Amino acid sequence: LSAALLKIQDPASGLWYQVPNFPGRKGNYLEASASNMFIYAFAKGARKGYLPSSYVATAQKAYAGALKHFITTDAAGFIHLEKTVSVGGLGGTPYRDGSYEYYLSEPLRQDDLKGVGPFILASLEMEIAKELPIGKGKKVVLDYFFNHETKNGQRFHYTWEDRKDSGFHLWGIQFEQLGASLDTLSVSPTHENLKGASVYIIVDPDSPKETAKPNYMNAKAADEIEAWVKAGGNLILLANDTTNCEIPQFNILAHRFGIEFVAPNLNFVQGKNWEQGAVYIPAGTPIFSPLKKIYIKEITQLKLSKTAKSILKLQGADVMAVAQVGKGKVYALGDPWLYNEYVNNRRTPLEFENFQAGKKLAEFLLK
């Protein structure tokens, strides 16, 4: 289909006519809704690897054409999308006969949502394309070994594919939109099976409360991960509150980098009293500046030594840290705070900037 669309693309504007097999014919016009859908499909298809990379240039040329031919600005400075056909179909009363004349007879509408929606999606792809070099060729691996919770026979809780509140689907999209690829590791980590990874994320290791037979962190696995970090790997350690996470064994690994997850937990939240989970980010905070406010509840504190440095405190306690280890780095926090529930702002007020923080952290790890 994409190859066929290239054959009927207007070479001058890069766009598509309302009746695309009759370009330049009297009365025919460049139409916004279809053109914007094709731009979006080409750009995203190439980014995701479904289409050849040559479609990027095709989409960019078409988008430039859309800005030139479809976008206007009124006297008040508001931007509008022009040339979206209001409707198209066959049959009915009055009878729609599918002729050339019929398809040109339907009225055009300014800012019709059928055109605006695809234009927004196409515009987002153009913005995403600017940041793809950040993570190009890099792989982000999410642990599925130490965290292996199932429900009704299905894996869930902090997984890339989980689109419900409990998953990391949105954070995964942020990594992909920075040019990185996603992967998982369902076996014990080794320097060998981590060799192709730029980032390795371990979240909320299982306790017997969550999994019948947990896979515990041990000295051998810690040796392998430490060697990988020293060689240039970037490690994320996200614990959970002490009642919902296996902490003692997890600390076998954390200790290698001067980090220890310790009680008591902070930021208990009652019901929808969101402010009880507020964490304010001081100006100049590494990684997250200029963000001001994020939401994290029931955080496990950190005890730091060696090269580990605190980058955020809460109630006087260290809660977020970074350690430079050899050629790599480690980021640690005592909560899985970037899962869908707390980045999509469907429940939490918009003043909480977890979504933006997730992108900031991804950029830090990929650069």
Model segments located where?
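Alpha-helical packing segments of well-folded alpha/beta enzyme cores
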Residues: L1, L5, M37, A41, ...
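Oxyanion-binding "anion nests"
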Residues: L1-P23, G27
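Secretory-pathway/luminal and periplasmic proteins that interact with or process carbohydrate-rich
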Residues: L6-P11, K68-A76, A263
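A glycine-rich, coil/turn loop motif that links secondary-structure elements
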Residues: P23-E31, V56, T190, G196
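Short, surface-exposed loop/turn motifs that are enriched in glycine and acidic residues
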Residues: G24-S35, K44, N240-T243
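Aromatic-acidic/polar surface patches that form glycan- and anion
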Residues: G27-S35, L108-V116, K164, L350-N354
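CBM-like carbohydrate-recognition segments
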Residues: L30, I39, R47-E131
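Short, surface-exposed patches at the edges or C-terminal ends of soluble domains, predominantly
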Residues: K130-K367
